[in-house]
Amino acid sequence: MMSNDRKVTEIENSPVTEVRPEEHAWYPDDSALAAPPAATPAAISDQLPSDRYLNRELSWLDFNARVLALAADKSMPLLERAKFLAIFASNLDEFYMVRVAGLKRRDEMGLSVRSADGLTPREQLGRIGEQTQQLASRHARVFLDSVLPALGEEGIYIVTWADLDQAERDRLSTYFNEQVFPVLTPLAVDPAHPFPFVSGLSLNLAVTVRQPEDGTQHFARVKVPDNVDRFVELAAREASEEAAGTEGRTALRFLPMEELIAAFLPVLFPGMEIVEHHAFRITRNADFEVEEDRDEDLLQALERELARRRFGSPVRLEIADDMTESMLELLLRELDVHPGDVIEVPGLLDLSSLWQIYAVDRPTLKDRTFVPATHPAFAERETPKSIFATLREGDVLVHHPYDSFSTSVQRFIEQAAADPNVLAIKQTLYRTSGDSPIVRALIDAAEAGKQVVALVEIKARFDEQANIAWARALEQAGVHVAYGLVGLKTHCKTALVVRREGPTIRRYCHVGTGNYNSKTARLYEDVGLLTAAPDIGADLTDLFNSLTGYSRKLSYRNLLVAPHGIRAGIIDRVEREVAAHRAEGAHNGKGRIRLKMNALVDEQVIDALYRASRAGVRIEVVVRGICALRPGAQGISENIIVRSILGRFLEHSRILHFRAIDEFWIGSADMMHRNLDRRVEVMAQVKNPRLTAQLDELFESALDPCTRCWELGPDGQWTASPQEGHSVRDHQESLMERHRSP
């Protein structure tokens, strides 16, 4: 067990040498000539306090804590709780691979640029380490003390080797020798065998063995294979009545793979004594950049960088909390890990593998099955009607997963591919599924002789390999594949279909908030606009020309496009909302801004919202993840509330509403630097009153005082809402009931 003393990090011991300018204030003595008084501020309302931002990294950890709260919620179906434990773990892995890795790189390079809330990279790393250790311990305790016993009560057991009887051990001996032993490679460490490379996110056993002859001890590492199931399913047993109720259900029993390997270490090290063994796991830096302006072939350059990703420097070491001091010291030394990057975990490491447990066939322990409904505009009729005919009658707003993706957006692309009157299809692809029907439709369209353009973002993090494969498949089919603009990720969700209709050419469009991915569309909440509006069609034509050619159009008719137009466009609308509010009078103004997004970090947008709040505009923010805005602070944000909704579906849509100026916008951009400065993003205005009424209903549901959520306080703390004793409604459940297929 690692002592608290050893956990004192360099972050705490090393003084921060950077001093802020205000700490060098010079005060003259009594005999010196005093400076003139400071200038009176021109506008007090424009002066914003320096502590107005919350730290974005700590806010992300708060988001993951909300995920963990769902896992701890005993009102949730049991296997859904296990699922949220897995999501928490995989979320934290990615946070360390990207965000923590970036902070460590800046710290190691001596780049002491402070965050918006005034912290250096080293100070942030210190706070992240402390908060992560607390969260990791809580995560483990929710599993060990709550979810694991509850699984046992339902006849689902995760057992240890000590729990098995001799017959089970004999069967597992055969399984080990036939299925596991051949793929294991025990690696010794001695003068002839250097310390082995440990790949990122792999689960390993650190083993100490002793030679019986002279008592010499040696270290060895055994990697738990990642191409076999983490949990070995044992032969079924009849569950006890207590565990399985009166149904006589057989018990499901699983043994962690590391337990099986540990039991057979003598087979791996014959003739040696096993002194100790402990599980550990390393996380490596996966935050890399491709020098696009230097490399002629972006695809090849990206493939080279992907090959290097597995060799990134360590950013976190997770260890079982029973690991000895000597074993840990060896790992720290050989892996070049700082003590401050060690996370002690009670029980099992890497609970992301609980997805395997979630997959068991126990529907009563999961959310009730939900089948998305076909949007009424696209419902089957006695006389078949194409999507194009429907869109000629009017725009359609789809809300996934409540409205089926496959019978709306996917069908839109599939009909375009099969329609002989369609001349061209242009589409952006950021993340798509492994067997994507969208991509297959584009391939079919190209093979049918249509002009097909696909903007494939091969730099979509952790989906690079899949997107490279799709890009090559599309090119082989004759699709014109482009990778967007140098230095920018193409993150917008847009599709354009050009169709000949008699003597005219008509353009049909889709602008959405979510990816063209039929699998995640069943799990992610998103909205999309399907339209034949000429102005949006002309805008998307200009946008695709700028992405595939040398056009550098910066202004559009009905779109806001990053990196040049979204931040300025939003701030302009906030200011217009303030002006409209003031024009109505201090007590009669109807200024109200409602925002729904994944993250709110951009300081310029936040400051614009603060100024609007000071002017009396009511502001309501629904944010899934990071929020750097501090709501409810006296003198700056009394008129701002921030709430977060998490649940069965991942809230992914980005929607903006400015009531006084009567504008609704949807699109792909969150309010983050990367979205507004380093990505091609699109926001589209929704003008049809029938569709804006749908968006208004969505906001009203999310902001209902009885809606189950968390609310952010001025101190940066999130609080569950509503309080006990009040009626509670579930935002997503209410939408499912409204859209549920008959």
UniProtKB/Swiss-Prot annotation:
The keyword Nucleotide-binding applies. GO terms for cellular component: membrane; plasma membrane; polyphosphate kinase complex. Residues 718-742 are annotated as: Disordered. Residues 726-742 have a biased composition (Basic and acidic residues). The keyword Ubl conjugation does not apply. One of its GO terms (biological process) is polyphosphate biosynthetic process. It holds the Pfam family PP_kinase_C. It is an enzyme of class 2 (transferase). Signal peptide: none annotated. This is Polyphosphate kinase.
